[in-house]
Each structure stands twice: as C-alpha cells, then as structure tokens.
Design a protein with these regions (language model features):
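Short, structured coil/loop segments at alpha-helix boundaries
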Residues: 1-2, 71
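N-terminal alpha-helical membrane-insertion module
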Residues: 2, 7, 26, 30-32, ...
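Amphipathic alpha-helical segments typified by the pilin-like N-terminal helix
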Residues: 19-40
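Low-complexity, acidic interaction segments enriched in glycine
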Residues: 57-210
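A generic short-segment signal for beta-strand/edge and adjacent turn/coil regions
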Residues: 15-17, 38, 123-125
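N-terminal alpha-helical signal peptides/signal-anchor transmembrane segments
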Residues: 38-59
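Hydrophobic membrane-insertion alpha-helices, especially the h-region
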Residues: 5-23
C-alpha cells in the first residue's frame, strides 16, 4: 500500500515538473520562432518593396500583380544618371562647357542588377519572392496597389502583408499565436502580422517593423 502511494506521488511529481517546465519552455521557444520567422519575412518584404519602388520610378504607379512585378525584375531595365567628370576637376569641366555638354549622362541597367545590391538574388529567389516563408511556397503575400485621392491629387499606393497565422506554427503554438494576434489587434489596434505600405494613403511604403 505504502509503495503504491509512493509510486503515485512519484508520477504526480514527474507530471508536475513536466507541466512547469513546459510552461517555461513553450513561451521561450515560441518567442524564438517568432523572432526568427519575422526576420525571414522582413527580408522578403524589403525585397518586394525595393522592386515596387523601382517599378514606380519607371511607370509612376505600383503593381498589385506578382507576375508583373517578377517580370519587371527579371526582364526590365532602369534609366540611371551619372556624372561624366569630377566637378572639382576644373580642366575637365571647362572642356565639357566648351563642347556644350552637361556633366551628366544617362544609361540603362537591368533591374535585377541594381535593386538588391549588394545582394545577388538568383532567378529562383526572384520567382519565389511572392511566397511567404514557411508555407512550402504555396501561400503568397497579400499584395494590393491602387491610386487614392490626396488633396485632389491621385497618389499611387501599395500594401504587402503576411499574417502571423500563415507563417507561425499554429499547431505547436496554437494558444501563443492566438494571444499574439489578440494583443496586436485589441491592445495595439495594429495589423496582426508584418506588412509595408498602406491602401489608405501614402506612407512612403513604411514597414510596421520599422
């Protein structure tokens, strides 16, 4: 009888230790996953934003279509400007003036060769820009573009976002994700995920992580 009670108490203690350890470990493990996966999503959002800004610089509008954006990155070019001579070089500047030339020239450069510098993205990387990390390349970022009226002027706007529930582990950390979303929405009145830009007005494509 006594041994039976001791055995049951032993099991209870082991169970209690497990519960306490899990209560400590799970939030720490979730915070680590949140930090790591947020970082991966932010890298892609920054790349998409760089592409959108380049697209706007050429076409005076953003695009809400990933096919168009990816085609732009892979196949289009940008017109850039550079100085012909150092403006502190008085002799060279005098020669340009004599020739009736301005100290500037334009040239074209492939979009893919400039917007991600100093990083180099492969064709596969670019084709997969549309996909949110940790979704097995099955779920795309939510991307929208339009024009909004701002002081009787039509202003191009863009928004690209990834909800927490799409890239966090909602099986292992179901309650943690629920609590995170509830906190963002109800306590901070903020988007429950990561995004840049806004469809409500121009905000210089600011990211909500910045």
């Amino acid at each position: 009888m006594k041994k039976g009670i001791q055995f049951i108490l032993g099991l209870a203690i082991i169970g209690l230790v497990y519960v306490v350890a899990n209560l400590i470990y799970t939030p720490l493990s979730f915070d680590q996953q949140l930090e790591e996966r947020n970082a991966e999503v932010i890298v892609k959002l920054k790349d998409i934003r760089a592409a959108q800004r380049a697209y706007k610089s050429k076409y005076q509008q953003f695009t809400g279509d990933f096919d168009s954006l990816i085609n732009f990155i892979l196949n289009d070019s940008l017109t850039m400007e550079r100085k012909l001579v150092d403006e502190d070089d008085s002799v060279a500047m005098a020669q340009l003036k004599k020739q009736g030339k301005k100290n500037i020239e334009t040239y074209n450069i492939a979009v893919v060769d400039t917007i991600f510098n100093p990083r180099k993205l492969t064709k596969e990387d670019i084709q997969n820009l549309r996909y949110i990390p940790h979704t097995d390349n099955k779920v795309e970022f939510i991307m929208e573009a339009a024009h909004v009226n701002a002081g009787n002027v039509q202003v191009p706007v863009v928004e690209c976002r990834a909800p927490y529930k799409l890239y966090l582990d909602t099986v292992a950390y179901r309650q943690n994700v629920i609590n995170l979303i509830d906190d963002r929405v109800n306590n901070f009145n903020a988007y429950a995920g990561l995004k840049f830009g806004s469809m409500e007005g121009s905000n210089n494509e600011a990211g909500n992580w910045e």
